Design a protein with these regions (language model features):
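A short, well-structured edge-of-sheet supersecondary motif
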Residues: 48-77, 308-309, 315-319
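Penicillin-binding protein/beta-lactamase superfamily catalytic region
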Residues: 162, 203-312, 325-328
Length: 430
């Protein structure tokens, strides 16, 4: 195959992959992609929707390249209905801390008492002074979370347990105080600051409401989708509005913030890590957060199955809002179940007919080690794999599985051919 052609093909592929659609700010208009364009099967989509309906969902949206592929509402919910984000809304607060830092109102390395005042905890002065905004963002304040109400922000509820940065615990109370940090340094409430800096430029709606000791965000599903799209594009809206200019903060927020729980960033949950910890536990578990999801997934998770999933390798965002699916608080496991249905959307059962490559299907993509090939190989086909420089790095006779374990990570081209024809496919090796 011509090397120059392959390199040009790669460049076009990368440009195409990078293009994102952004819906108008002051409109309900939102471009769509037909599932048929993605080779998604109606019966698989029906199975996904049936599962969501059976688990008391209210809303589900899936974006590809910024456009809506799937949008479904259940149980009386509709496009204009607001619903709570629960702890998924923590990611909004993290984003606003990043905005406050880029505007020089604060630094996340500042001690929290600089903005909350001395005596905001029941610790000694030296213990309290050691707690920073960064510790609040990463759930590593060292304050005792084993209290009657983990959301209580009274000083008597905030007691020393370990030095900041040495213990990870999912503790709502220190997080809840971040809105006071913003208000005391910016001079605006979190809601008003968000309205100016986030909601207006992206077209989001919504509001943080105080429910007991917790501030809970309510919005439409499409507003949650807008935030996911903003995150997918690195804090940039529409290509010419870089809302989050502090790229260091942005990148840190969606990567491991510490090594105690590497599956946690700045209030975002991270997939693809070798270990993780979960709320209400000090146990470290081996393995990924969501085994059915791509490794580069980062996700906002909230009580009763609220979730916002962002997958850069697939230019995909999807969300679920709803009631508790199993009459109990859930986080990662339910999200993983939804991923199992999403992975089945592609019509992989289609065969490769004799002399016809139009229906060949690869999965998973992105892939780690083994690439499965779906089809009925009634003729002899060969495969060749090329890197981004157009160099052939592997080849062989096509079977139902290709071993990619020895191939470096990155974007590659797979060529399937016989004496009659050939076809190119993009794959991403993780």
């Amino acid at each position: 195959m011509n090397k120059i052609f392959l390199i040009i093909y790669f460049q076009i592929s990368l440009i195409t992959q990078a293009q994102l659609y952004f819906p108008p700010v002051n409109s309900n208009t939102w471009d769509t992609i037909s599932p048929l364009q993605l080779s998604w099967c109606d019966n698989k989509i029906d199975s996904l929707f049936q599962f969501l309906d059976s688990t008391d969902s209210k809303a589900f949206i899936l974006l590809k390249d910024g456009k809506i592929v799937l949008e479904k509402y259940f149980n009386g919910h509709d496009i204009s209905s607001d619903w709570y984000w629960a702890s998924a809304g923590k990611t909004l607060t993290a984003f606003m801390i990043g905005i406050a830092q880029q505007e020089n109102f604060l630094s996340i390395t500042d001690t929290s008492s600089s903005y909350l005042g001395s005596g905001w905890t029941n610790c000694t002065s030296s213990q309290e002074e050691a707690i920073t905004i960064w510790h609040q963002l990463t759930m590593t304040t060292g304050l005792n979370d084993n209290v009657n109400d983990p959301s209580c922000t009274e000083d008597t509820c905030l007691n020393f347990l370990s030095s900041p940065g040495t213990r990870w615990a999912y503790h709502n109370a220190p997080y809840n105080l971040i809105d006071q940090v913003i208000e005391n340094t910016v001079g605006l409430s979190l809601n008003w600051y968000m309205h100016q800096k986030l909601k207006t430029p992206t077209g989001m709606n919504g509001l943080f409401l105080n429910l007991g000791n917790d501030d809970v965000y309510f919005s439409t599903a499409r507003s949650m989708a807008r935030f996911g799209l903003l995150m997918l594009n690195g804090g940039n809206w529409g290509g010419n509005n870089q809302i989050m200019t502090d790229t260091s903060f942005f990148n840190a927020s969606i990567n491991s913030s510490q090594n105690i729980n590497p599956a946690y960033g700045y209030l975002w949950w991270l997939n693809g890590k070798t270990q993780l910890m979960l709320p209400s536990s000090q146990l470290q578990f081996n393995g990924k957060l969501n085994t059915n999801a791509p490794d580069d997934l980062y996700v906002a998770l909230g009580k009763n199955g609220q979730s916002l999933n962002v997958v850069p390798s697939q230019n995909m965002v999807w969300l679920r809002m709803g009631e508790s699916p199993y009459n109990m608080p859930v986080l990662a496991n339910f999200n993983n179940e939804i991923w199992s249905y999403i992975n089945e959307l592609n019509c992989n059962a289609l065969n490769i007919n004799s002399g016809d490559l139009s229906n060949i299907k690869f999965h998973p993509n992105p892939v780690e080690n083994f690439l499965s090939v779906k089809g009925n190989f009634s003729e002899h086909f060969n495969y060749s794999i090329y890197n981004q420089l157009g160099k052939k790095i592997d080849s062989g006779i096509l079977t139902n599985k290709i071993d990619l374990s020895a191939i470096k990570t990155g974007l590659h081209i797979v060529e399937i051919s016989n004496q009659k024809q050939d076809k190119l496919f993009k794959i991403l090796k993780n």
